[in-house]
Every structure is written in structure tokens, then in C-alpha cells.
């Protein structure tokens, strides 16, 4: 069989490089290097640290459960509960750091592709892996053996949808900006999904005696996790809080509500359910916002930036 040589096989027929394409010896390519800004990326590092500590605390709790089954002295339900509660607070800490890194980057004009990618990698650990392990612990260890696989499937589905949600966000962020100035999130953001799981687990752990089986609530956690996985990959729009105008009257009420929420979180009698209420309101708001009047949406937008 004869093989006809292509133009690329004949050196004499190859197109010559133009002067602009010829690499210049000693050329300065520093302008092509990704810009790394210190303060926003320190916040992202704090996010990643909290996620790592959350995963570590969950593993310690799981190890404690095995030691309790083996009858090792010194291990109690209370000590195991403390490990899981620490993991929940570390996830909340990651939410705060994640909020700060974006704010600082925008205020200082320091948004960059590097920061966006670094933030997504940290989010996979803090808001993907840690909540997935928390769900697998809360669900898997209490399900009947014949349907034990359900806990693993639900947990991994959440992690998978969270990672895909972050990948989609990065792709959309790299595209030209919306000419209408729409800054909404497409699908519930993974920090909010993680916060909802952590707050619900925190609520249930305080409603039941330490070491007591959650019973039917196991299946509620399964349904919530599946619902959050679907919402992360949905086209439901959620406010990003990027357009808060501190000079408006609505922002004053936003500050009042935020201060009140912080006070309730730190109050002994309300701290167990306040986070769950906050994350639930955000989740519901995204679902019902299209049904609200334009006037009400505009008023809420001035208050919460959405």
C-alpha cells in the first residue's frame, strides 16, 4: 500500500514561523505567571485547615466507636460525641473562612484564576469530603446490615455532586461576565449544602441522648443529603451576597439580622438550632424566590445582597 506524504512530512513545505511566533531568547514571561495574593489565599488556607481537622475529628470518632465496641476502658459515648461535635464546628469554621476569602479578594481587587482554583480544591475537602464522612457516620453506622450500602452510595453521591458543582462554577467563572450583572449562584453553593448537613447533624445530636440510635431520622438524613446533591447540580439560582450595598437602608437591616443571628448562635439555649434555621431559610429562599414579587425580591436583595 502506498502512503502519500502529507505537507507536514515535507520540511520544505512547512509554513515558516512569523517573527511573533519565534521564541525570543531571554524573553520575559513573568506576565503569564498566575498571580498569588497573600491575604485571600491565607483565608483559603484556613478553610482547608478546618476541613482537614474536621476529617481528622470524624476519623477519631469512628476509631472511638470501634474501641467502645471492643470494651476498651476510658472510651465513652460522650468522648465520641465530642469528636463529632468538633468536626461540625470545624465545618462551620470553613464556611466563615470561605466567606472571608471571596470578600477580601473582591474588596482588594485581588480576584485571580489561582485563587479560584485553590478555593475549589479546599472546598472539595471542607465541604465535600468532611460532610460526606459525617453523613456516612450518622447514616451508615445505624442502618440495618442488609442496606448498609445505602449510606456509602448517598455519601459518595453528595461528594461527587459537590465536586462537579465546583467544576461547573469554575467553568462559568472563566466565561465572559453576564452583561446584566447577574451574580447569582447556579445551584446551591457547596458551602451552604455542607453547612446545612453540619447544622442538621448538630441539631439532632443535641435533641437525642448521647449514644442513642436516631431511628427514623436516619432516613431523613438520607433524603436531605440526596436533595442537596440534586440542588447542587440544578439550575436553581441562589444569592451570592456579592452585591451588598452598605449605603442602602436595606443593608442596615441586614446588619441587624446578622448581629441577631450571631447572638443566637452563641446563646446557650438557642445555639443548637439557630444554624439549622439559617441554612434552611437560605435553601428555601432559593426555591421560592422566583415566586416572589419583584418589589419583595428587590427589598430582599438590598438586605442580603441577593
Q: Which role does the model predict for each range below?
A:
Residues 52-60, 128-138, 195-203:
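Membrane-interfacial alpha-helical segments at the cytosolic side of multi-pass membrane proteins
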Residues 72-83, 143-152, 185, 211-220:
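Interfacial loop-to-helix junctions that mark the boundaries of transmembrane helices
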Residues 2-99, 278, 289, 295, ...:
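Topogenic membrane-insertion module of multi-pass membrane proteins
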Residues 102-113, 163-180, 233-241, 287-292:
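C-terminal ends of transmembrane helices
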Amino acid at each position: 500500500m502506498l502512503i502519500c506524504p502529507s505537507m507536514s512530512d515535507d520540511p520544505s513545505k512547512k509554513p515558516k514561523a512569523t517573527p511573533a511566533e519565534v521564541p525570543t531568547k531571554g524573553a520575559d514571561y513573568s506576565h503569564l505567571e498566575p498571580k498569588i495574593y497573600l491575604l485571600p489565599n491565607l483565608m483559603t488556607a484556613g478553610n482547608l485547615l478546618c476541613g482537614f481537622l474536621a476529617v481528622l475529628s470524624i476519623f477519631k470518632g469512628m476509631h472511638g466507636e470501634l474501641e467502645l465496641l471492643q470494651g476498651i476502658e476510658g472510651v465513652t459515648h460522650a468522648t465520641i460525641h465530642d469528636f463529632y461535635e468538633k468536626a461540625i464546628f470545624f465545618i462551620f469554621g470553613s464556611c466563615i473562612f470561605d466567606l472571608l476569602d471571596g470578600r477580601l479578594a473582591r474588596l482588594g481587587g485581588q480576584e485571580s484564576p489561582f485563587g479560584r482554583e485553590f478555593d475549589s480544591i479546599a472546598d472539595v475537602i471542607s465541604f465535600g469530603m468532611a460532610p460526606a464522612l459525617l453523613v456516612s457516620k450518622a447514616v451508615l453506622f445505624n442502618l440495618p446490615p442488609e442496606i448498609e450500602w445505602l449510606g456509602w452510595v448517598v455519601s459518595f453521591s453528595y461528594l461527587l455532586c459537590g465536586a462537579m458543582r465546583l467544576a461547573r462554577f469554575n467553568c462559568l467563572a472563566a466565561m465572559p461576565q453576564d452583561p446584566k450583572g447577574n451574580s447569582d449562584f447556579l445551584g446551591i453553593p457547596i458551602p451552604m449544602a455542607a453547612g446545612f448537613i453540619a447544622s442538621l447533624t448538630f441539631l439532632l445530636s443535641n435533641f437525642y441522648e448521647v449514644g442513642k440510635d436516631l431511628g427514623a431520622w436516619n432516613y431523613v438524613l438520607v433524603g436531605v443529603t440526596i436533595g442537596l446533591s440534586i440542588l447542587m447540580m440544578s439550575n436553581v439560582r441562589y444569592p451570592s451576597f456579592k452585591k451588598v450595598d452598605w449605603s442602602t437602608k436595606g443593608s442596615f437591616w441586614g446588619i441587624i439580622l446578622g448581629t441577631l443571628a450571631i447572638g443566637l448562635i452563641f446563646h446557650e439555649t438557642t445555639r443548637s438550632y439557630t444554624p439549622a434555621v439559617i441554612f434552611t431559610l437560605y435553601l428555601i429562599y432559593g426555591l421560592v424566590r422566583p415566586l416572589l414579587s419583584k418589589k419583595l425580591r428587590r427589598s430582599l436583595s438590598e438586605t442580603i445582597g441577593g
